[in-house]
Amino acid sequence: MSRNIVIKGAKVNNLKNIDLTIPRDKLVVLTGLSGSGKSSLAFDTLYAEGHRRFVESLSSYARMFLGQMDKPEVDLIEGLSPAISIDQKTTSKNPRSTVGTVTEIYDYLRLLYARVGVPHCPVCGKEIKQQSLDQIVDRILALPEGTRFMVLSPVVRAQKGMHEKVFADARRSGFARVRVDGNMYDLTEEIALDKNIKHTIDIIVDRLVIRGDIRARLSDSVESALKVSDGRVTVLVVDRDGEGEELEFSQKYACEEHGISFPELEPRMFSFNNPIGACPECAGIGNMQRISVKKLIPNKSLTLRDGGIAVNGFKTLTEDSWTGPLIAAVGKDFGFTLDTPLSEFSEEAMDALMYGAGARRYSVTRYFGGTGKDQTTTFDGIVRMIEKRMRMAGGDYYQEFVEEVACPRCRGRRLSDMVLGVTVGGLNIDEICSLSIEKMLAFVESLTFGEEETKIAKEILKEIKARLNFLISVGLDYLNLSRTAGTLSGGEAQRIRLATQIGSALTGVLYILDEPSIGLHQRDNGKLIGTLKNLRDLGNSVIVVEHDEDTMLAADFIVDVGPGAGIHGGKIVAAGTPEEVKKCEKSITGAYLSGRKAIAVPTERRRGSGEFLRIRGAEENNLKKLDVDIPLGTFTAVTGVSGSGKSSLINSILYRTLARDLNRAITYPGKVESITGLEHLDKVIAIDQSPIGRTPRSNPATYTGLFTDIRNLFASTRDAKAKGYDAGRFSFNVRGGRCEACEGDGVKCIEMNFLPDVYVKCDVCKGKRYNRDTLDVKYKGKSIYDVLEMSVEEGITFFDGLPSLKRKLQTLFDVGLGYIKIGQSSTTLSGGEAQRVKLATELSKRSTGKTIYILDEPTTGLHSEDVSKLIAILQRLADGGNTVVVIEHNLDLIKTADYIIDLGPEGGDGGGTLVATGTPEEVARCEKSYTGAFLREKLGLS
């Protein structure tokens, strides 16, 4: 096999026909400015082709289920292995997906509990023993005299299939009837089952009535049932209505005192995704949705007449509305009127308003469309009325008023009481999953068993320990297995999948990772690099898109893509060992690695306006009654190891409180006693890396408001006025000026059954999105299509005499986006580019000097050169008197902040406290701070 991966003529996106040779079975870092073409090379070329070749080798039937990728624009790739991509975007939002299920540790735990678990009665907690035939018969005979019942043999429990053999075996054994999914059938008739649905089948062994002379017959029937279903029997007690309760018995396990039988323990019983083990109330989700009174009443100072209830249908409650007269009548009984502020409602009155007035009836005149209707009716309460509407009309609108609460039956534990009664080492499966990874490893290592159980558990424990160690090696020791996958950050989810891949121990694979260091503190970087090297040493090629200096220096080979971004990028600037790249004069990466270039430390720090945002008693997630002050008018960095509580403090508490109180948004802040100092601010703006739009129609021009100015400009031209065109004519989102053949998209989607959908340029407008009449309207000789195809840099020159347009374009240029097209589809922008479009939009607005900007890891996806530009923008915002709060791990950005709030000292349970505050120099001197230790070196204080 070739010792290199050879790429020739790569032309995907902005790649300029590049040729590149990458060594196989090495740790290779692809780096370069944001938008330089790194992802195009790594994911759209190498991964796409590696995955495509693998999928192409499968049958056409298999390809239907495997989403095939386009063949990338590349002349040749040699030495390519099957590719696995580990990026940030594929985090499961399924509430059933947890850290335990994603890493497969939960599967091994289920096996462990099924094989060596000790069952306990869920009522009394006593250890459960096996039942004998005589004990089972005695229990049945204890039923009241005259009770009619059936003896059933449970042969299939919630299993897919047609189960023809089960029916055939039952016929051969002389049985006459079966119960399938609760329905009775004669075995003489043909029973056709859907093989894709789970079925439960019981053979009816006997029908009996409790009398004094049935012991012998009952004993024979029970014995027959036990024999057929491997030690289990069900007794269906039939009452006169045909309904009845079921009693389950097992020769395996049962609590004699409470008559509770356990089936034989098997792994699927411990799965919350299987109906056998899942909590019957919440079906294994662990929580339930209900209407939140807190969300219905965001502002308690309002009255019912003034819109105190935030839901449509209840916002305007007056005497001449439909619901108003009824609520006013209820108010007479409970001491409120439509003009009583909700904050003054008694507990009883609020309960009646929300959950109803019981059986009381009210005679009222209700109005609809100005017409009155006399009615005598009960009042169900606003919550119940909304629930009824949700059932009848679907609940999309009402979702914003719904909250998730722990299931009242399982209390969020997802499993049935019976399953939670099984323990290993004194803990049930939920309790062990609630431990942090670090504590769970210590617990697993301390387990001791008898001789036989030790033999059974040995291999299972070995797999569990290995996977827990892999999670610790990627810096995730603070997580627990019951954490839902949807609540993980992109970096955490990526590192979990990385740990899972190491656990699978594949060799000869091409792994492509997208910035695995995101969200990771410098302290844990060494662990991550060790993990990447471990993956390489198994015999794999590891290609990492990364900007982290430590990772680059630890790599075997660096590829620097550039030299600039967008149209100025797409070339290979340098390729070689870290030492070779350092020496390359053309490489910006080399300049930063060698120290020729560096981000400067400010000569002085802002002291701020003298006012503070004072947060008191923050207790969200792992925060431990935290008190912290944020100086206004400064650039503040919030730091700490992963899981220390940064996002809980800033995103869940601070941002949501500010958005609610300053922006009047409907948000629900995390647990905090108080936040004061809001009177010194006028609004809060969160700038993240989420896309600026989800469709190809969205672009930087539409997001920044530039497109409105451009359309107005074209509508004001002589040509447009002569034809009677207004600004709407120049929109590709509405009929009129757009090309109707492609509906303004510029491309058409051709569906291909066994191949990926193909997008072809519209043959009518040739990809220009507008019809010919619209394109005939020119400004300075350019059509609207020509303007949207210009780069921001070209646009500044073109619109030189138009201050409003030029200002918006200039801010895009200032944030380093001079290379992107004015009308470039938002779906093609990277996270870093999308964030800078948002920053540019803010910079182009007139500053009030009283705004607070909140950014969560803004350096994600940014090269050191881009970080330098980002810092300049943030400093510019702070220079205007605004407050900038940034959650960050990047030391280059942290060292330029005016003030640092360092949380920790560890992640998870070991975090949530204030470790250090002050200027970077002050935090660097704090011995307890991990951030301070790394800052000392950056600031040259060590």
Language-model region placement:
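Conserved phosphate-binding elements of NTP-dependent enzyme cores
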Residues: M1-S942
